[in-house]
């Protein structure tokens, strides 16, 4: 934003020492050779002197680990990290503001699904920490710590280390298990448990004896009961069986009951939930660098103060809102009408009517004058500062109107939840369309106000001078006043700074205004007078000729015969 630090700096050159006409003072505004086009309510293309781009279109090619804490899942997604899959041990105890999931993350253990995948993913991401609290579970006459060849850890058969696979005992027994855990703490607990779906009935009886099995998990407010779905499936890491993982939140004072006759994948403890933490998740292949930024997208971090961005609709942290427009320019200067070089110093000089002054560099509004001492140009601080004060806070006000920071994660749903995914995408697309429209309308409103304000200040300056001069000068209709008294540079300065005393010059101005001067004929007046003179001469010549003919006819000197 232009900051005016020079008060009425006069750029003058006495190039017209021999000027003998009446002094002239004109008002105009700043202009540049090439302005910037902005959109207003009334016009899609209005040229202004200066404008500020509001849409960020450049991003860093990396993710910034400061000030937000980033945790790189590497080959593990957040759910595998919570289950304790092999290869995810680096996530034990991890704490984050943003959990970075990689597109190349893979499952490395027994094949599984999560019926409420998106909900569990969101809970884990928002919690911001893998704070696992191990517990003692007293299971009755069953074998614990089941392992699978699909789940290798250091080339040894293993399993998810946060879960306990219960199978029948060596004595071929799997009695009813009924175990209760009470939450006596002051925080909510997240229990993750599973149900194994064997591929055949033989596998079911070999592992659990009972066919069918059943798993029921209850709290005071909820109950989930699952019967295993026995059936052959495509082999994944050598297994045609599957595990379905479920989750239950136990609030302080509540309890959880595990009831099963087979197929339970039991928890080894719980995750501590932090309701105060507001963390999130981002799926991207962009590497983590060493920069600083509060905003991250799937295409890289943003470092900007602009209120909008069109880089990515997926953004986390303290981010500008995503809009579809590639550019939205906020006018920070007045309407630009470049000066016409052929007009000269005082040819149609009214900047707010016809054109601006490119030489007016110290302010937005100013004066030009011509008197016996020469010519000069000076900026006017008062009107300039008045306009700047009204415009200066526009960007801040615009940011305040959009201060609900944009935060949009990419939601992932299981394949069976495709309709939910479609609905989610439709809602997000609609929100973006609305925000894009609102942003464009908001900027257009602000631009219209800016142009109206700057035009108004130009008119105020003109009226201020007119009220000072009154009948001491004549408005020439082009932004200039012809002054009818002697006005040296000190007099001109008094007009500019508002200290001009009309009464001092009143008598002189009145005398000069009504003084009879010789007629100064311009080429246009000469033509009119010549035509009038010629017409009168012709009329008199014809009249004399007719009078002579009538006189001659009466005296018999001329004989007229009219034949029909």
Swiss-Prot record:
Residues 17-527 are extracellular. Residues 1-16 form the signal peptide. It is found in: Virion membrane; Host apical cell membrane. GO terms for cellular component: host cell plasma membrane; membrane; viral envelope; virion membrane. Belongs to the influenza viruses hemagglutinin family. Disulfide bonds join 26-480, 64-291, 76-88, 109-151, 295-319, 487-491. This is Hemagglutinin. The keyword Lipoprotein applies. The keyword Membrane applies. The lineage of its organism: Viruses, Riboviria, Orthornavirae, Negarnaviricota, Polyploviricotina.
């Amino acid at each position: 934003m232009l900051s005016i630090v020079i008060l009425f700096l006069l750029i003058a050159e006495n190039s017209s020492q021999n000027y003998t006409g009446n002094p002239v003072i004109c008002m105009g505004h700043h202009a540049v050779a090439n302005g910037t086009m902005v959109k207003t309510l009334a016009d899609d293309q209005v040229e202004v002197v200066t404008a500020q781009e509001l849409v960020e279109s450049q991003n860093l090619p990396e993710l910034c680990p400061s000030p937000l804490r980033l945790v790189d899942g590497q080959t593990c997604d957040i759910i595998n990290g919570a289950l304790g899959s092999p290869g995810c041990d680096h996530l034990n105890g991890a704490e984050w503001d943003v959990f970075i999931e990689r597109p190349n993350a893979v499952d490395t253990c027994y094949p599984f699904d999560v019926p409420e995948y998106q909900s569990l993913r969101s809970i884990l991401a928002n919690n911001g920490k893998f704070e696992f609290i191990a517990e003692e579970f007293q299971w009755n006459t069953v074998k614990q710590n089941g392992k699978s060849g699909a789940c290798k850890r250091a080339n040894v058969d293993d399993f998810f280390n946060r879960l306990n696979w219960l199978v029948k005992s060596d004595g071929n027994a799997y009695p009813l298990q009924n175990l209760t855990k009470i939450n006596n703490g002051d925080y909510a607990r997240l229990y993750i448990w599973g149900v194994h779906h064997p591929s055949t009935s033989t596998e079911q009886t070999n592992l659990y004896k009972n066919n069918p099995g059943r798993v029921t998990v209850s709290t005071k407010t909820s109950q989930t009961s699952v019967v295993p779905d026995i059936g052959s499936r495509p082999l994944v890491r050598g297994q045609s069986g599957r595990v379905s993982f479920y989750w239950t939140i136990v609030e302080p004072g509540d309890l959880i009951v595990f009831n099963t006759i087979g197929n339970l994948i039991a928890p080894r403890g719980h995750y501590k939930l932090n309701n105060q933490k507001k963390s999130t998740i981002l799926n991207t292949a962009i590497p983590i660098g060493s920069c600083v930024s509060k905003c991250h997208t799937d295409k890289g971090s943003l470092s900007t103060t602009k209120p909008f961005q069109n880089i990515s609709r997926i953004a986390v942290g303290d981010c500008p809102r995503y809009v579809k427009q590639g550019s939205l320019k906020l006018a920070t200067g007045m309407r630009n009408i470049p000066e016409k070089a052929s007009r000269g110093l005082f040819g149609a000089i009214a900047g707010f009517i016809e054109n601006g002054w490119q030489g007016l560099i110290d302010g937005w509004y100013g004066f030009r004058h011509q008197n016996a001492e020469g010519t000069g140009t000076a900026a006017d601080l008062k009107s300039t500062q008045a306009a700047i004060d009204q415009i200066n806070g526009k960007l801040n006000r615009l940011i305040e109107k959009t201060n609900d920071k944009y935060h949009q994660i990419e939601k992932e749903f299981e394949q069976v939840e495709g309709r939910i995914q479609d609905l989610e995408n439709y809602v997000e697309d609609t929100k973006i369309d609305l925000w894009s429209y609102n942003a464009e309308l908001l900027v257009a409103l602000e631009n219209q106000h800016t142009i109206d304000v700057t035009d108004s200040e130009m008119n105020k300056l003109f009226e201020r001078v007119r009220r000072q001069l009154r009948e001491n000068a004549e408005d020439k209709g082009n932004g200039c006043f012809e002054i009818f008294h002697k006005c040296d540079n000190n007099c001109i300065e008094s007009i500019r700074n508002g200290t001009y005393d009309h009464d001092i010059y009143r008598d002189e101005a009145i005398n000069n205004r009504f003084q009879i001067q010789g007629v100064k004929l311009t080429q246009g007046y000469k033509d009119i007078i010549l035509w009038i003179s010629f017409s009168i001469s012709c009329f008199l010549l014809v009249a004399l000729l007719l009078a002579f003919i009538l006189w001659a006819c009466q005296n018999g000197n001329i004989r007229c015969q009219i034949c029909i």
